[in-house]
Amino acid sequence: MNAAAEAEFNILLATDSYKVTHYKQYPPNTSKVYSYFECREKKTENSKVRKVKYEETVFYGLQYILNKYLKGKVVTKEKIQEAKEVYREHFQDDVFNERGWNYILEKYDGHLPIEVKAVPEGSVIPRGNVLFTVENTDPECYWLTNWIETILVQSWYPITVATNSREQKKILAKYLLETSGNLDGLEYKLHDFGYRGVSSQETAGIGASAHLVNFKGTDTVAGIALIKKYYGTKDPVPGYSVPAAEHSTITAWGKDHEKDAFEHIVTQFSSVPVSVVSDSYDIYNACEKIWGEDLRHLIVSRSTEAPLIIRPDSGNPLDTVLKVLDILGKKFPVSENSKGYKLLPPYLRVIQGDGVDINTLQEIVEGMKQKKWSIENVSFGSGGALLQKLTRDLLNCSFKCSYVVTNGLGVNVFKDPVADPNKRSKKGRLSLHRTPAGTFVTLEEGKGDLEEYGHDLLHTVFKNGKVTKSYSFDEVRKNAQLNMEQDVAPH
């Protein structure tokens, strides 16, 4: 086998080991397995444990998985042989379903006889509703539905990043509106600093793209190519950045030359926004003496379009932001906006990019509001918390079988563990509907076929190896927009 073939993705090896044995475990004469994915509600969770509730989720990322891993001819003679050899050693037994995979190769030229129905990408759906369903389209391939659970459930990651990012957008929108009267610049208030903090290059692309569903600022370049390739945008790029300093470009000048470093950098980038990390030695001295006195003349002459953005990067995030604002407020002319909140001059802003997660973000904007500082003055950078400090458990992302056909008879199936009612699964064929009141409802046991519920919001996105429906990134963003009354209005 040549190196290229060896490196090629093999869906036969992209499943949990135990699934290799499941074709032997279903009831005899099973001809259909139908499963669904949801972000389960946690009805019995102690609300004190978690500050953020995450009552709704942003559905995003399935389109990437379908296009990258499942469409087209994904089964070949070589891949079957490779899997056969691996599993023979892995299980120390011949348990691999060689016959089943050969059937797919011969009858469908290696295309998967599967249908996936899903809500539109970017949809914001309350927890506990069906998000996508999966079923085999050939009765011989009943075992295939849950074989691909493993790769499909990895959509938990983009869903969770997009959801968490959107919840932070709600917080920022609420406080920006309260302290300024408008939402100008909202989509640049939370910048992705997470590239180095994620587990892999692929994670970076997926996670960054999920954040860009809600915002437009990113330093994780990998997200741009993924969006362009798998979604497409009307804009040349979906995310933007600005020139910025890191500690090395400051400390390389030496401890006694921080002022020279600052001066050089703001001069190099005089007509665009520039962010300068200012805590290499003493953030407060930097703000008061260097920016506030020594280089003040270079800052006040900058335009509204090219502000200096001072970046603290250590200490308690709330205390640091407030103290930096306080110092800058004494050194530069502060105005009061229409809402009565303090505003730095347009050529000067602050970005907090250290220790920012959804909880510290809430604390910082609340602290600023109490001290009468407008949120217009600041933006935030988040890295590990935005892209990596998340698990499948945060939104309880789960994939379960709800319907099977055995001996020609359809049976609604479910699990309902005695020790955890939260793990009860749905029964039968599922559909998602809008009620007349505008809320979402999942209908179980095929009841969505009854006309009074209106059309099903699940659309076929994949069938027999083909992606049948795609969404542009602009559509995804539109679907995920904040609802001004619901999400932003003061509660």
From Swiss-Prot:
Phosphoserine modifications at: 472
Top-level EC class: transferase
Record-listed beta-nicotinamide D-ribonucleotide binding positions: 219, 311-313, 353-354, 384, 392
Intracellular or extracellular location(s): Nucleus; Cytoplasm; Secreted
InterPro entries in alphabetical order: Aldolase_TIM, DUF5598, N/Namide_PRibTrfase, Nicotinamide_PRibTrfase, Nicotinate_pribotase-like_C
Record-listed E.C. numbers: 2.4.2.12
Tissue and organ expression note: Expressed in various tissues. At the highest level in liver and at the second highest in heart. The amount is higher in heart than in lung.
Phosphotyrosine carried by residues: 188
Recorded metabolic or biological pathway in which this protein acts: Cofactor biosynthesis; NAD(+) biosynthesis; nicotinamide D-ribonucleotide from 5-phospho-alpha-D-ribose 1-diphosphate and nicotinamide: step 1/1
N-acetylmethionine: modified positions: 1
Gene Ontology cellular component annotations, sorted alphabetically: cytoplasm; extracellular space; nucleus
A biological process term (GO) from this entry: positive regulation of smooth muscle cell proliferation
GO molecular function: cytokine activity; heterocyclic compound binding; identical protein binding; nicotinamide phosphoribosyltransferase activity; nucleotide binding
Catalytic activity: beta-nicotinamide D-ribonucleotide + diphosphate = 5-phospho-alpha-D-ribose 1-diphosphate + nicotinamide + H(+)
Residues that bind diphosphate: 196, 247, 311
Family per record: Belongs to the NAPRTase family.
Name the record gives this protein: Nicotinamide phosphoribosyltransferase
The gene coding this protein: Nampt
